[in-house]
Regions:
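Hinge/lid segment of periplasmic solute-binding proteins
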Residues: 102-156, 184, 295-297, 363-364, ...
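Glycine-centered hinge/linker elements that transmit conformational signals in sensory
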Residues: 187-191, 227-257, 286
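Extracytoplasmic/periplasmic solute-binding protein
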Residues: 144-151, 155, 165, 182-230, ...
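Short, well-ordered beta-strand elements
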Residues: 40-51, 68-73, 96-97, 146, ...
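Extracytoplasmic "Venus flytrap"/periplasmic binding protein-like
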Residues: 59-130, 147, 165-168, 265-266, ...
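C-terminal capping/gating helix-and-loop segments adjacent to ligand/active sites or protein-protein/ligand interfaces
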Residues: 368-424
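Short, low-complexity disordered leader/linker segments with a strong preference
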Residues: 1-44, 423-429
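Extracytoplasmic/periplasmic substrate-recognition and gating elements
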Residues: 246-250, 287-348, 353, 409
Length: 429
């Protein structure tokens, strides 16, 4: 998971458009074959839900593979996964490589017949490259491997030192980490912050982000080990809701929808002091508010550990160049590529050798006050334990984000919104 954009993907998203595109492509292919003028250039389209930091790598790959032309399609997180599902259903319209976020990987790996089994293209020889649980997350029920892992989202808290200072709180990252061993302690710090905060500044950005971080530390959370939805019966999910609501009702939240334009503006204007911060969030903050360099630092996450996000590169079977697509995906997820992306964007590698390497452990991010981000996030990633994920993980996450927003916008009470959330979960799952 990484910088999310709202740019619509410039490709067909309806069945009619897909069928028209197929007809045009077939006619063009027939004409080029008949004339003998068909180009040897292979165009590979890569479908992403944000900036993965691949642009320099594309150029490098094209230089060493002169017959390959790479095009990138970017759209918002929910639209990307929704449209991918549609394209798979109709058998056309998918890109040669499609990214899938961990919240949706269970949904797509339940349809392995729609993806290339990467084991048949040699991926088995790469298995030890990844954390064991990361490799396993994209294994389909029939044993097929449908994706190559990109990053993992081990957690921390990114905070504005200048705003902490104005509120009379410590600014040193070690001292700040000690303020909140638990999420309840985090809310208590928020209460202190609000008493002395600069006008218009809130302690955290969005209740949904706090809730998601707490959920990321649970196992099980939304699903049990048998794949049953347990949202309503898991007391830890309700406890996560309750502690989040304390911050929301305590007016500690800016009440922003994550990845919205208002949220992006909040980074620029400094309207919130903390954000739950998976490793990939570093690149997002840098991209949204470059002029805040040096004002941010990174502390430990309350509760310790947890993983929020991380993605995979898949190869839909409907593509015309599946072998070439796999080769590109293999390059983009190679150790050298993932190490490069980490230093450029903060997306944490999902490969143990890299997580233990001096290149990662010794890396400090100047934007975040030279925080030892490799050490902070890398050490956490090595201790991560996979969470049980189900086919509607992403849908449930969307439903709870909407539920929290209803409370933040004073449309429903916490109790009524929770009950509505449970109804919504039942409807989608």
């Amino acid at each position: 998971m990484r910088t999310f954009l709202k740019t619509p993907r410039r490709r067909a998203t309806t069945l009619a458009a897909v069928l028209v595109a197929l007809a045009v492509a077939a006619a063009a292919f027939a004409a080029s074959t008949a004339s003998g003028s068909r180009s040897d250039t292979v165009t590979l389209r890569v479908g992403l839900f944000g900036d993965f930091g691949y642009h320099d790598l594309y150029a490098k790959y094209e230089k060493s593979h002169p017959n390959i032309d790479i095009k990138e399609d970017i759209e918002s997180y929910p639209d990307h996964h929704s449209n991918l599902a549609k394209h798979l259903a109709v058998g056309a319209g998918a890109d040669d490589i499609e990214s899938v976020e961990v919240g949706f990987i269970a949904q797509f790996k339940s349809q392995p017949n729609l993806f290339v089994n990467l084991k048949k293209l040699g991926a088995n020889s790469l298995q030890k490259q990844w954390l064991g649980w990361k490799w396993q997350q994209s294994i389909a029920p029939n044993g097929a491997q449908i994706g190559l892992g990109t990053d993992v989202g081990s957690l921390a808290i990114c905070y504005r030192k200048d705003l902490f200072k104005k509120a009379g709180l410590p600014t040193n990252r070690d001292a700040v980490s000690k303020l909140w061993p638990t999420w309840q302690a985090y809310m208590n710090v928020g209460k202190r912050f609000q008493k002395h905060a600069p006008k218009g500044v809130k302690f955290f950005d969005a209740g949904s982000n706090v809730f998601n971080a707490i959920i990321a530390q649970l196992n099980p959370a939304y699903y049990d080990s048998h794949g049953k939805v347990i949202v309503g019966s898991n007391p830890k999910v309700k406890a996560a809701w309750d502690v989040t609501m304390k911050g929301v009702q305590g007016k500690q939240t800016a009440g922003l929808a994550a990845f919205s334009n208002d949220w992006n503006t909040g980074y620029k204007k400094g309207t919130f002091a903390t954000v739950t911060c998976p490793a990939w969030m570093m690149g997002y903050i840098q991209g949204q508010a470059p002029k805040t360099k040096g004002k941010w630092d990174i502390a430990a996450v309350p509760g310790g550990g947890g993983n929020w996000g991380g993605s995979f590169l898949t190869v839909p079977k409907q593509g015309s160049h599946t072998k070439e697509a796999y080769d590109l995906a293999k390059f983009l997820t190679s150790p050298a590529s993932e190490a490069y992306i980490f230093k450029q964007t903060g997306n944490l590698p999902s490969q143990p050798k890299l997580l233990k390497s001096a290149a990662v452990l010794g890396f400090k991010n100047p934007f975040f006050s030279n925080a030892p981000v490799g050490k902070i996030f890398g050490a956490s990633a090595m201790k991560l334990k996979p969470q049980v994920l189900g086919p509607h993980q992403g849908d449930i996450q969307t439903a709870v984000s909407n539920a929290i927003q209803r409370v933040e916008q004073h449309k429903q009470s916490p109790d009524k919104s929770w009950k509505q959330f449970l109804k919504d979960v039942k409807a989608v799952s």
